[in-house]
Swiss-Prot record:
TM region(s), chain numbering: 389-407, 410-426, 442-471, 535-554, 573-593, 639-658, 725-749, 771-809
Phenotypic consequence of G551E: In DEE104; uncertain significance
Name of a matching Pfam family: V_ATPase_I
Keywords: Cytoplasmic vesicle, Disease variant, Epilepsy, Glycoprotein, Hydrogen ion transport, Intellectual disability, Ion transport, Membrane, Phosphoprotein, Synapse, Transmembrane, Transmembrane helix, Transport
Name of the featured protein: V-type proton ATPase 116 kDa subunit a 1
Upper lineage: Eukaryota, Metazoa, Chordata, Craniata, Vertebrata
Similarity section: Belongs to the V-ATPase 116 kDa subunit family.
Its membrane topology: Multi-pass membrane protein
Length: 837
C-alpha cells in the first residue's frame, strides 16, 4: 500500500556537526522541520548543559520583549504583523539585540517612572484644587445661622455660658466616594458626635497614577475642637486612606493658593502631554518590529535548547546528535546541512550517518489542510503503531457518512454546508487574523470535516426525503387512492373510519418504488414511524456489519506487512469466518427479504428477528413456521457450527503453535547473536519461526537487541483467551452499538417535527391581518431553536456517536494505537505565533 495508508518510513540518523557550524545547521533543520532530536544527555541537569548561558540570555531578551509588548497593548497600539519569516540571527548578533532591548526597556521604565510621578503630582494638585473650591463653599455656608445652631453642640455648656468665642479647628481632604458612609459612622462613634463633617462629590472621576483606573472621589472637611479630637480625626483619616491637604483659614489665602495651583496644573499638563507623546513614539517604533524580534529571539532559544540535546566530542570540536527523520526526506536534510555549513563559513562538511536500531521509530503521517482534521480524530484515540494501517484515509468518507446517517436532514445539511463553505472561502483571512477564541479555533480547524458532514447530510436527507421534517414531492408519489374506491371503498367507508390503510396488492394502488429515497406520501401516513423504524434499523445493521468487516479486512494488511503468518492463520481467518457466518448471513437475509417479497406478497413476509433467534436455538417448529428459502435449516445449522468452531480455533491453536515453536528452538539449541547462528543449524521452517519472533518484537527503550525471552505458555493462553472473548462478545455488542445510527436519526427527525409543529405551524395558522408580524416572530424562534438545538446540540451528539463508532467498533479490529508521535524540531509554531514550548 502507498504511503497514504501507512505512516512514513523513518530512520535513526547520527549527525556530526562542527562546533562553528552546529548553530547554522540546526537553524536550517528548524526551518525544514523534518527531524526529531533525541536527548543524548538525559542524566545531565538542565542547568549543567553546555549552552545553558545562551538559553538564559535568550530568556532574558524574551522577558524584555514581553514587557515591551505589554506596554504596547496597554497603550492600544496595533502590533504590525506582515507575516515575515526573518532569518535566525548569528550568535555574534546576540550582543546587539541585547543592547537594543536593554535600551528600549530602560527608556520605557524611565518614562513610566517619570510619568507616574507626574501623574501623582497632578492628582494631588487636582485634589487640592477641588478642596479649595469646595471648602470655600463650606465656609460660606458656615455664615448661615441655622448651620451655626446645628454646630453648637461642639461647645461645652459651660463654655457657652461664659460666652467664650467659638474657636474650631478643621481638616480637609479627599476620600474614595464608596467609603464615605462608613467613614462618617466611624467619626460619629469615635468622636461621640463632637465633630461636624461636610462632604461634596467631585463630579469627574480622577485617574489613579499607579493602576491607571478612574476613581470617583469626594471632598470632605471636618470641624472639631481640641487637640485630642484632632488626633483622633487624623488617625481615622489615615485608616480610611484619605488624603489630607493644608487649607488656609482666610478666603484671601485660599484664593491665592487656588490661583497658584491652577497655574501649576496647567504647566504639569503640558509636561504630561509631552511625556505621553514621547512614550507613544517609542512604543509605535517598537510595535513595527516586535513580532520580528520575538521570532528571532525564540528561534535562537529553540536552537540552543536543541544543541543542549547533543553530545560534545572529546576534542570539543564536534557535536554529535541523533535524530529521527523520514527516509524520503534524507536528501532535503543533507541539503539543509550543506546550506548551514556554507552560512557558517566552515570548510568541514557536516556528516549524516544512518544507524541500525531495534527501537520503535515515531509515527509520522503526512497531512495537508484537508486531511489534518481527520488525522486528529484518529490520533485522539491513540497514535498509531509504527507503519501500521492508518485509518485516517478511510475516516475521510466513513466518519461524515455515519454522522449524516444520524443527522440526515436536507435542510439542516444545507445550513451546515453553507457555514463550512464560508469558513473554507475565508480561511486565508481568518488565519491571518489569528483568532484567540479557543472554541472558534477548534471549529475552524475542522472546517473540512464540517463541510463533508453537511454534504453527506444533504445526501442522507434526500434518501430519507426529510427537509425540516417535511418531505419533498419531486417525482410525485407512487401511491394512488383512486383504485381503492374502484374496488371496495365507499363514502360510508370514509365516514366510518378515521384511519384507512391502502392495499398495495390491488392493481394501481402502488406504482413501484420511488425513483430516489423514500416516497413523500409516508410523511402524512399514521404508520410512518413503523415503516421508517424498520427501514433505518435494518440499514444500521447493514452499515455496521460492513464497517466492521472492513476493519477486520484491514488487519490482514497489517499481518502481511509485519510478516506475522500466525496472526493470519489463527486470527484473521477465524475472525472473518465467525463474523460472516453469523452477522454477514443476517445482512444477506435482509437483502433477500427485500428482494423476495414485494408489495403484493408482503403479507406473507416472515419476521427476520424470529428466524435469527431460532437459528441460534436450532428451533424449527413444524407448524406455523415458514422458511425463507429451501434448505434454510441445513445452511443455518452449518453456519452456527462453523462459527462455534472458530472460537477454539482463535483460542487454542496460536498458543499451542507458539509453544511448539519454543520447544523446537530450545531442543535445537539455536541462538541468534546479531544474525550469526551458533549450534545446530535450524531447518528452513525453524528459520522462518525465528524471523517471525524477531519481527514481532518492538522495543522503544532498549538500545541493544534483547535476547530471546522465556516463553510463558500460561500468560500467552490468558492473553489469547481475553482476545477471543473480547472479539466474540464484541461482534454482538458492536453490532448492537450500530443501532445508535437508527436511534439518533429517529431522535433528530422527531425533534425537527416537534419544532415545526409547535412553532412554525402555529405562526402559519394565524389568518388575521397581523399574521405576517406573528409569523415573523415565530420564524425567528424557529430559526433560533433550529440552530441551537438541531444544528449545534444534535450535531454535537451525532459527532460524538460517530467518534465512538470509529474508535471502538471500527478501529479496534485492526488498529492498536500504541505508538508515539513524530515531533520534529521546527520553527513553524514560532512563525505562527504559538510560542508555548
Amino acid at each position: 500500500m502507498g504511503e497514504l495508508f501507512r505512516s512514513e518510513e523513518m530512520t535513526l540518523a547520527q549527525l556530526f556537526l562542527q562546533s562553528e557550524a552546529a548553530y547554522c545547521c540546526v537553524s536550517e533543520l528548524g526551518e525544514l522541520g523534518k527531524v526529531q532530536f533525541r536527548d543524548l544527555n538525559p542524566d545531565v541537569n538542565v542547568f549543567q548543559r553546555k549552552f545553558v548561558n545562551e538559553v538564559r540570555r535568550c530568556e532574558e531578551m524574551d522577558r524584555k520583549l514581553r514587557f515591551v509588548e505589554k506596554e504596547i497593548r496597554k497603550a492600544n497600539i496595533p502590533i504590525m504583523d506582515t507575516g515575515e519569516n526573518p532569518e535566525v540571527p548569528f550568535p555574534r548578533d546576540m550582543i546587539d539585540l541585547e543592547a537594543n532591548f536593554e535600551k528600549i526597556e530602560n527608556e520605557l521604565k524611565e518614562i513610566n517612572t517619570n510619568q507616574e510621578a507626574l501623574k501623582r503630582n497632578f492628582l494631588e494638585l487636582t485634589e487640592l484644587k477641588f478642596i479649595l473650591r469646595k471648602t470655600q463653599q463650606f465656609f460660606d455656608e458656615m455664615a448661615d445661622p441655622d448651620l451655626l445652631e446645628e454646630s453648637s453642640s461642639l461647645l461645652e455648656p459651660s463654655e457657652m455660658g461664659r460666652g467664650t468665642p467659638l474657636r474650631l479647628g478643621f481638616v480637609a481632604g479627599v476620600i474614595n466616594r464608596e467609603r464615605i458612609p462608613t467613614f462618617e459612622r466611624m467619626l460619629w462613634r469615635v468622636c461621640r458626635g463632637n465633630v461636624f463633617l461636610r462632604q461634596a462629590e467631585i463630579e469627574n472621576p480622577l485617574e489613579d497614577p499607579v493602576t491607571g483606573d478612574y476613581v470617583h472621589k469626594s471632598v470632605f472637611i471636618i470641624f472639631f475642637q481640641g487637640d485630642q479630637l484632632k488626633n483622633r480625626v487624623k488617625k481615622i483619616c489615615e485608616g480610611f486612606r484619605a488624603s489630607l491637604y493644608p487649607c488656609p483659614e482666610t478666603p484671601q489665602e485660599r484664593k491665592e493658593m487656588a490661583s497658584g495651583v491652577n497655574t501649576r496644573i496647567d504647566d504639569l499638563q503640558m509636561v504630561l502631554n509631552q511625556t505621553e507623546d514621547h512614550r507613544q513614539r517609542v512604543l509605535q517604533a517598537a510595535a513595527k518590529n516586535i513580532r520580528v524580534w520575538f521570532i528571532k529571539v525564540r528561534k535562537m532559544k529553540a536552537i540552543y535548547h536543541t544543541l543542549n540535546l547533543c553530545n560534545i566530542d572529546v576534542t570539543q570540536k564536534c557535536l554529535i546528535a541523533e535524530v529521527w527523520c523520514p527516509v524520503t526526506d534524507l536528501d532535503s536534510i543533507q541539503f539543509a546541512l550543506r546550506r548551514g555549513t556554507e552560512h557558517s563559513g566552515s570548510t568541514v562538511p557536516s556528516i549524516l550517518n544512518r544507524m541500525q536500531t531495534n527501537q520503535t521509530p515515531p509515527t509520522y503521517n503526512k497531512t495537508n489542510k484537508f486531511t489534518y482534521g481527520f488525522q486528529n480524530i484518529v490520533d485522539a484515540y491513540g497514535i498509531g503503531t509504527y507503519r501500521e494501517i492508518n485509518p485516517a484515509p478511510y475516516t475521510i468518507i466513513t466518519f461524515p457518512f455515519l454522522f449524516a446517517v444520524m443527522f440526515g436532514d436536507f435542510g439542516h445539511g444545507i445550513l451546515m454546508t453553507l457555514f463550512a463553505v464560508w469558513m473554507v472561502l475565508r480561511e486565508s483571512r481568518i488565519l491571518s487574523q489569528k483568532n484567540e477564541n479557543e472554541m472558534f479555533s477548534t471549529v475552524f480547524s475542522g472546517r473540512y470535516i464540517i463541510l463533508l458532514m453537511g454534504v453527506f447530510s444533504m445526501y442522507t436527507g434526500l434518501i430519507y426525503n426529510d427537509c425540516f421534517s417535511k418531505s419533498l414531492n419531486i417525482f410525485g408519489s407512487s401511491w394512488s387512492v383512486r383504485p381503492m374506491f374502484t374496488y371496495n371503498w365507499t363514502e360510508e367507508t370514509l365516514r366510518g373510519n378515521p384511519v384507512l390503510q391502502l392495499n398495495p396488492a390491488l392493481p394501481g394502488v402502488f406504482g413501484g418504488p420511488y425513483p430516489f429515497g423514500i416516497d413523500p406520501i409516508w410523511n402524512i401516513a399514521t404508520n410512518k414511524l413503523t415503516f421508517l423504524n424498520s427501514f433505518k434499523m435494518k440499514m444500521s445493521v447493514i452499515l455496521g456489519i460492513i464497517h466492521m468487516l472492513f476493519g477486520v479486512s484491514l488487519s490482514l494488511f497489517n499481518h502481511i506487512y509485519f510478516k506475522k503468518p500466525l496472526n493470519i492463520y489463527f486470527g484473521f481467518i477465524p475472525e472473518i469466518i465467525f463474523m460472516t457466518s453469523l452477522f454477514g448471513y443476517l445482512v444477506i437475509l435482509i437483502f433477500y427479504k427485500w428482494t423476495a417479497y414485494d408489495a403484493h406478497t408482503s403479507e406473507n413476509a416472515p419476521s427476520l428477528l424470529i428466524h435469527f433467534i431460532n437459528m441460534f436455538l436450532f428451533s424449527y417448529p413444524e407448524s406455523g413456521y415458514s422458511m425463507l428459502y429451501s434448505g434454510q435449516k441445513g445452511i443455518q445449522c452449518f453456519l452456527v457450527v462453523v462459527a462455534l468452531l472458530c472460537v477454539p480455533w482463535m483460542l487454542l491453536f496460536k498458543p499451542l503453535v507458539l509453544r511448539r515453536q519454543y520447544l523446537r528452538r530450545k531442543h535445537l539449541g539455536t541462538l541468534n547473536f546479531g544474525g550469526i547462528r551458533v549450534g545446530n543449524g535450524p531447518t528452513e521452517e525453524d528459520a522462518e519461526i525465528i524471523q517471525h519472533d524477531q519481527l514481532s518484537t518492538h522495543s522503544e527503550d532498549a538500545d541493544e537487541p534483547s535476547e530471546d525471552e522465556v516463553f510463558d505458555f500460561g500468560d500467552t493462553m490468558v492473553h489469547q483467551a481475553i482476545h477471543t472473548i473480547e472479539y466474540c462478545l464484541g461482534c454482538i455488542s458492536n453490532t448492537a452499538s450500530y443501532l445508535r445510527l437508527w436511534a439518533l436519526s429517529l431522535a433528530h427527525a422527531q425533534l425537527s417535527e416537534v419544532l415545526w409543529t409547535m412553532v412554525i405551524h402555529i405562526g402559519l395558522s394565524v389568518k388575521s391581518l397581523a399574521g405576517g408580524l406573528v409569523l415573523f416572530f415565530f420564524f425567528t424562534a424557529f430559526a433560533t431553536l433550529t440552530v441551537a438545538i438541531l444544528l449545534i446540540m444534535e450535531g454535537l451528539s451525532a459527532f460524538l456517536h460517530a467518534l465512538r463508532l470509529h474508535w471502538v467498533e471500527f478501529q479496534n479490529k485492526f488498529y492498536s494505537g500504541t505508538g508515539f508521535k513524530f515531533l520534529p524540531f521546527s520553527f513553524e509554531h514560532i512563525r505562527e505565533g504559538k510560542f508555548e514550548e
